[in-house]
Amino acid sequence: FVTHCKDTKLHNIKMHYAEGMGLLAQMSENIDLDGFSVCLKGDNDARYFTTQADATHFSNCKGLILSENGLYENMMDDAINVHGVYLKVQQRIDEKTLLASFEHTQSYGFDWGFAGDTVQFIRSKTMELLDGTYQIASIRPEDQDSVCGAKVFRIAFTQALPVEVTPEQSIGVENLTWTPEVVFAHNTIRHNRARGSLFSTPKKT
């Protein structure tokens, strides 16, 4: 589990089994995998599966995710999944302040963003982007004393927000600062149950 890290290198590592994901990384910058493999021990391995979920999973990371020269086999899910985490607008306090919440029942209680981050707004029903980007002035949990366990954040911005940013319009918030570039090259993916590679980022892949 990699969180709140920078310039992490995982080289020449073989992972043979995990009850969940093989590698989970979030809120981290620049992750370098070279020869990182999720694989059976060999042709005579008694197991049929390696991980019960994704081999590698990256959520709300930034900088560069570099994954090269790996073998990913016999997973119950993807070899690599890169994505961000949207918040949903729940209340507009004033022209610069919102309450926004995590919506996934298994994904909450961690940092989503920081003062100075840049975000954009998206219509959740059509995936259309609203014009412009906006900078966070301050962000704090609203429903808990700390980020741990929090589902709702109070977010103040440095500039006035579009009039469309209301809960009635079903608006999502994407943190552009915490989106990575991805290089996934010279890897082998085989014998897995689900998909291969998933990249959900507005940056270069």
Language-model-detected regions and their locations in the chain:
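Extracellular beta-strand/beta-solenoid scaffold signature
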Residues: F1, Y17-M21, R47-F58, V82-V85, ...
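Short "repeat-start/strand-capping" segments in structured domains, especially the N-termini
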Residues: C5-K9, Q26-D32, G63-L66, P180-V183, ...
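Short glycine/acidic-rich loop motifs that flank beta-strands on beta-rich extracellular proteins
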Residues: E19-A25, K41-D54, G63, M76-V82, ...
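Repeat-solenoid scaffold signature
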Residues: N60-N74
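A generic structural motif
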Residues: T97-F102, A137, P141-V165
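Ser/Thr/Gly-rich low-complexity blocks that favor extended beta-strand/coil architectures
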Residues: Y108-C148
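Glycine- and charge-enriched low-complexity intrinsically disordered segments
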Residues: F157-W178, V183-F184
